[in-house]
């Protein structure tokens, strides 16, 4: 059956009380590679028009396993070498720690075109930073940030041990299994993943706010791209805003490129005043502009701030409050990244490295101006 027809005939979703079970007894083993099933996906799953998200190469829809009633996520990719590469890399990683599992893959027709349909576990807990945003007045601590970074690092370590570079590690690709307190954080979307061999990666595709410096120039890059992204995510976790910004409203600007390539960022007060030196040191090691000097994933996992996360101070951070106050800007940044994902390519000629005495961070400037205005009327302090 054509997928389009199946969507129209999907009918109501199964009731929430239907017991859940594994979506498919034929799910691949850890790191397995398999051929897609050739029969109709609708034989096994009831499709919904509910869009759960947008990946690099295709949209993600809600679906239900007909036998068990379990809610799953379906990603639709039009068949191409790039799509098959995404499926292959995700299949190799599926079942690894803190990585979204593939449950089934089908090869069907959709709009008279051959497509691949990836059935994945449904991540009902939402995005990493949305979860922190929604905490309200409940403090988010440095120890919690360390535990989150350890989980993300565990996923990257699994990939790198199998010579896979994810190349698009960013907040939107980090999802929770549920809204429960003990939900597991997992990495998804292998649309830009590549196997790392003796030929270093050179394809200029990336998400601009989390892109390593060497991606912006003619240098080769490899797994160290993921390490740079870990540094940016860790920075945001500890303060609520990223270290680099485009001040022009573009997804990525020449000024932002220069700041990234020069590694120009700071640890401004008050957001960073109480953050431990161990955390700042780890960020510096991850954001090294020379990929050969950047930490490997093994070194990252062995860093005291990560492997001794239980003794990291429980210092309350500004992160949740900053994310809430700047929610509109954060959404704008995400929209810019989404639109840039599939279309942006690097123009090396625009990269002109000049020494910048200060970093002009648009969001930070706005925050400082607002703080200056409020401090004139009140001497109180917020030590969240």
Curated annotation (Swiss-Prot):
Motif mapping: Nuclear export signal (NES): 337-346
Domain Protein kinase positions: 46-306
Ranges where the record places region Disordered: 1-22, 359-384
A matching Pfam family: Pkinase
Residue ranges crossing the lipid bilayer per the database entry: none
In-chain residues carrying the UniProt-annotated modification Phosphothreonine: 203, 315
Biased composition (Low complexity): 373-384
Principal location listed in the UniProt entry: nucleus
Family annotation (PROSITE patterns): PROTEIN_KINASE_ATP (PS00107), PROTEIN_KINASE_DOM (PS50011), PROTEIN_KINASE_ST (PS00108)
Region (p38 MAPK-binding site): 347-371
Superkingdom of this protein's organism: Eukaryota
GO molecular function, one term: calcium/calmodulin-dependent protein kinase activity
Subcellular location(s) of the protein: Nucleus; Cytoplasm
Notes on activation and inhibition: Activated following phosphorylation by p38-alpha/MAPK14 following various stresses. Inhibited by ligand 5B (2'-[2-(1,3-benzodioxol-5-yl)pyrimidin-4-yl]-5',6'-dihydrospiro[piperidine-4,7'-pyrrolo[3,2-c]pyridin]- 4'(1'h)-one) and ligand P4O (2-[2-(2-fluorophenyl)pyridin-4-yl]-1,5,6,7-tetrahydro- 4h-pyrrolo[3,2-c]pyridin-4-one), 2 ATP-competitive inhibitors.
Residues with the N-acetylmethionine modification: 1
Family: Belongs to the protein kinase superfamily. CAMK Ser/Thr protein kinase family.
Protein name as it appears in the record: MAP kinase-activated protein kinase 3
Species this protein is from: Bos taurus (Bovine)
Lineage of the organism: Eukaryota, Metazoa, Chordata, Craniata, Vertebrata
């Amino acid at each position: 059956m054509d997928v389009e027809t199946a969507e129209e005939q999907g009918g109501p979703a199964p009731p929430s009380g239907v017991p859940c079970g594994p979506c498919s007894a034929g799910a691949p083993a850890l790191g397995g590679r398999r051929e897609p099933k050739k029969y109709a996906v609708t034989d096994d799953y009831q499709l919904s028009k509910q869009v759960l998200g947008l990946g690099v190469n295709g949209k993600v829809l809600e679906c239900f396993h007909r036998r068990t009633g379990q809610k799953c996520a379906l990603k639709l990719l039009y068949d191409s070498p790039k799509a098959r590469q995404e499926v292959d890399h995700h299949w190799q990683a599926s079942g690894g720690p803190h990585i979204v599992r593939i449950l089934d893959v089908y090869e069907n027709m959709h709009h008279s075109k051959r497509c691949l349909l990836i059935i994945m576990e449904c991540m009902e807990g939402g995005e990493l930073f949305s979860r922190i945003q929604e905490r309200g007045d409940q403090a988010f601590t440095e120890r919690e940030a360390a535990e989150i970074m350890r989980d993300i690092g565990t996923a990257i370590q699994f990939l790198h041990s199998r010579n896979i570079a994810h190349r698009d590690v960013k907040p939107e690709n980090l999802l929770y299994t549920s809204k429960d307190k003990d939900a597991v954080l997992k990495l998804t979307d292998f649309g830009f993943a590549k196997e790392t061999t003796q030929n270093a990666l050179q394809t200029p595709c990336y998400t601009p706010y989390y892109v390593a410096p060497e991606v912006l120039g003619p240098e080769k890059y490899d797994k160290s791209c993921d390490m740079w992204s870990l540094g940016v995510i860790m920075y945001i976790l500890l303060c609520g805003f990223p270290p680099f910004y485009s001040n022009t409203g573009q997804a990525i600007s020449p000024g932002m490129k220069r700041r990234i390539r020069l590694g120009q960022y700071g640890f401004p007060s008050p957001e960073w005043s109480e953050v431990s030196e161990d955390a700042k040191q780890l960020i510096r090691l991850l954001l090294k502009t020379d990929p050969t000097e950047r930490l490997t994933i093994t070194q990252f996992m062995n860093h005291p701030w990560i492997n001794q996360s239980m003794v990291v101070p429980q210092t309350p951070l500004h992160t949740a409050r900053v994310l809430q106050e700047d929610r509109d800007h954060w959404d704008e940044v995400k929209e810019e990244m989404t639109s840039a994902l599939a279309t942006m390519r690097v123009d090396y000629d625009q990269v002109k490295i000049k020494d910048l005495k200060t970093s002009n961070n648009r969001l930070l400037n706005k925050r400082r101006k607002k703080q200056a205005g409020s401090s004139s009327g009140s001497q109180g302090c917020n030590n969240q």
